[in-house]
Amino acid sequence: MSLFGDTIAYLLSLTEDGEGKAELAEKLHCWFGGKEFDLDSALEWIKNKRCLTDIQKALIGASICFLKPKDQERKRRFITEPLSGMGTTATKKKGLILAERKMRRCVSFHEAFEIAEGHESSALLYCLMVMYLNPGNYSMQVKLGTLCALCEKQASHSQRAHSRAARSSVPGVRREMQMVSAVNTAKTMNGMGKGEDVQKLAEELQSNIGVLRSLGASQKNGEGIAKDVMEVLKQSSMGNSALVKKYL
């Protein structure tokens, strides 16, 4: 895969599946695909995207600034504050040393990625802020390599936390994870599906899950809710049934 393709993949790995992720993917493919775009407008879109966390906004915003450093008229607080606000004084010092001594000598994406892998996330965040504030001191490949290494660490932490919740020893947590998964699936299919029958089905599923939450569901029944919803979606006429069966 190309340098930009790798970057898109790592950035998308940070976000949860859903309609917002599909919209973000379309934007990233446009920005990294070589099409001309206005940097300020792109940054405003990222800043106002509600489905993204502050860290995600900062990383995605920094990545497109690395694409067009000459068009960057001013530094954005929604990028600098999350990057500089994490960690201790010691980790920030490590990040500064990493940026000033090691990354300045790097010349390739993979070299920067391998060096960054050996550092903790808070140090990498501060290192990226230094790169963002001094774009002319580093090549685009080095900046994106450092960013992708951090994305891999962040995605790993997020997926471990999600798996931990899904395997929780508390039945109520597992049940709610199933319900959240079912609601997200219904909302996504409602937004992406074509035809009134698809949208009606998705709305009914959301309504039924809401009723179950209001009335309460037994531990045993609650755990099967998401599976039942998935089965209904698979059996319905929702356009590309092959994709539905593959991902649901």
Swiss-Prot record:
Bilayer topology term: Peripheral membrane protein
UniProt similarity note: Belongs to the influenza viruses Matrix protein M1 family.
Keyword terms: Host nucleus, Membrane, RNA-binding, Viral matrix protein, Virion
This protein's name: Matrix protein 1
Intracellular or extracellular location(s): Virion membrane; Host nucleus
Taxonomy, superkingdom: Viruses
Main location: virion
Origin species: Influenza B virus (strain B/Ann Arbor/1/1966 [cold-adapted])
Region annotated RNP-binding, chain positions: 165-248
Signal peptide: none
Gene Ontology CC: one annotated term: virion membrane
Subunit structure: Homodimer and homomultimer. Interacts with NEP. Binds ribonucleocapsid by both interacting with genomic RNA and NP protein. May interact with HA and NA. Cannot bind NP without genomic RNA.
Pfam family, one: Flu_M1
GO MF annotations in UniProt: RNA binding; structural constituent of virion
Upper lineage: Viruses, Riboviria, Orthornavirae, Negarnaviricota, Polyploviricotina
Miscellaneous note of the record: Influenza B virus genome RNA segment 7 encodes the M1 and BM2 (AC P13881) proteins. Normal translation produces the M1 protein. The M1 termination codon overlaps the BM2 initiation codon in an overlapping stop-start pentanucleotide 5'-UAAUG-3'. Termination of M1 translation triggers reinitiation on the BM2 AUG in the +2 open reading frame. Most abundant protein in virion. When expressed alone can form virus-like particles in transfected cells.
Motif Nuclear localization signal per record, residues: 101-105
UniProt-listed GO biological process terms: viral budding from plasma membrane
Residues covered by region (Membrane-binding): 1-164
UniProt function note: Plays critical roles in virus replication, from virus entry and uncoating to assembly and budding of the virus particle. M1 binding to ribonucleocapsids (RNPs) in nucleus seems to inhibit viral transcription. Interaction of viral NEP with M1-RNP is thought to promote nuclear export of the complex, which is targeted to the virion assembly site at the apical plasma membrane in polarized epithelial cells. Interactions with NA and HA may bring M1, a non-raft-associated protein, into lipid rafts. Forms a continuous shell on the inner side of the lipid bilayer in virion, where it binds the RNP. Determines the virion's shape: spherical or filamentous. Clinical isolates of influenza are characterized by the presence of significant proportion of filamentous virions, whereas after multiple passage on eggs or cell culture, virions have only spherical morphology. Filamentous virions are thought to be important to infect neighboring cells, and spherical virions more suited to spread through aerosol between hosts organisms.
